[in-house]
């Protein structure tokens, strides 16, 4: 069972929380990315495989080799790696904060856990690791959920939000003039 993380290796990403998973039987950790905390994380996660920074086909192959994707950072505004993992058909365990709230349907495509809670993170990964049928169910649901989230669709959605704000603000601006 390969549990993976992809992202910047920086303190605010809380990759150190992966240490709570190292003792799970049959679980191997794969950490993809680089950053200022890499050396410290190698000490905290001595059994993890550190794969370095990857892009394109290399990154796609890494996602394809994972069984579960874990995102640990509580401050993501978008969560590109969460979306990439879901598009790769991976169940995702992520903090119930920021971007993952829009990308992970708790109990459907993965699990949302309290930010910074290693016990909840471990429990969620354990549940998925122990149940291949649940992983397969979440995998299919995750992929379906992000199929329509192309850059074009996201840009259109963002433009719609801007237009709504402008439309709402215009009457107020006219009154103030």
Where are these regions (language model features)?
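Short alpha-helical donor nucleotide-sugar binding micro-motif in glycosyltransferases
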Residues: 54, 61-66, 158
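C-terminal alpha-helical cap of glycosyltransferases
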Residues: 151-177
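Aromatic "clamp/platform" in nucleotide-sugar-dependent glycosyltransferases that forms part
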Residues: 74
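Short hydrophobic beta-strand element within catalytic cores of glycosyltransferases
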Residues: 91-94
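Conserved acidic donor-binding segment of nucleotide-sugar-dependent glycosyltransferases
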Residues: 106-107, 111-118, 127-132, 147
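Nucleotide-activated donor-binding/catalytic signature segment of Leloir-type glycosyltransferases, i.e.
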Residues: 39-57
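A conserved mid-protein helix/loop that constitutes part of the nucleotide-sugar donor-binding site
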Residues: 1-24, 36-40, 119
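Short alpha-helical segment that forms part of, or immediately flanks, the ligand-binding pocket
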Residues: 60, 78, 83-87, 101-102, ...
């Amino acid at each position: 069972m390969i549990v993976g993380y992809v992202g910047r290796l920086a303190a605010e990403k809380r990759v150190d929380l992966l240490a709570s998973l190292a003792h799970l039987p049959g679980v191997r950790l794969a950490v993809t990315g680089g950053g200022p905390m890499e050396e410290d994380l190698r000490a905290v996660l001595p059994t993890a495989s550190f794969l370095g920074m990857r892009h394109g086909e290399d990154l796609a192959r890494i996602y394809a080799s994972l069984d579960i994707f874990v995102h640990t950072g509580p401050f993501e505004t978008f969560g590109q790696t969460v979306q990439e993992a879901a598009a790769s058909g991976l169940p995702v365990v992520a903090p119930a904060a920021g971007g993952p709230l829009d990308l992970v349907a708790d109990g459907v495509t993965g699990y949302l856990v309290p930010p910074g809670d290693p016990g909840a993170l471990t429990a969620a990964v354990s549940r998925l690791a122990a149940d291949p049928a649940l992983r397969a169910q979440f995998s299919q649901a995750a992929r379906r959920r992000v199929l329509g989230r192309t850059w074009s669709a996201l840009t259109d959605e963002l433009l719609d939000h801007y237009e709504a704000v402008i439309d709402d603000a215009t009457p107020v601006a006219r009154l103030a003039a």
